[in-house]
């Protein structure tokens, strides 16, 4: 079980992702934008940040950069409909973020998260 923060501006996608990850046994919190996610990251530790690349205000890449300052152990996975275009020319991204392109199947999302996290313990435990 991992503690996951989902940052996604689309309400239905955010709910869909959170529900699937909870059914897979993870503890999930959600944020509607990058600024809300930063506030949540300041209050608690997470194992994984699952962020949409394109969000109003603060995009997922900037969110990941800021999150890495406070939680360097945080794993990052981006979800986007156009990963190659959205991430082109983005230098200074923390760690080795994974990218999952929309559309995707839930079993692929869960499998990639499980692979990314391995047997990591719950953050803050």
What are these regions (language model features)?
Residues 5, 30-48, 68-69:
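Acidic, metal-coordinating helix/loop segments flanking the phosphotransfer/catalytic sites
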Residues 8:
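Conserved acidic carboxylate
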Residues 52, 80:
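Active-site residues of response regulator receiver
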Residues 62, 82-101, 107-112:
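Alpha4 helix (beta4-alpha4-beta5 surface) of REC/receiver domains from two-component response regulators
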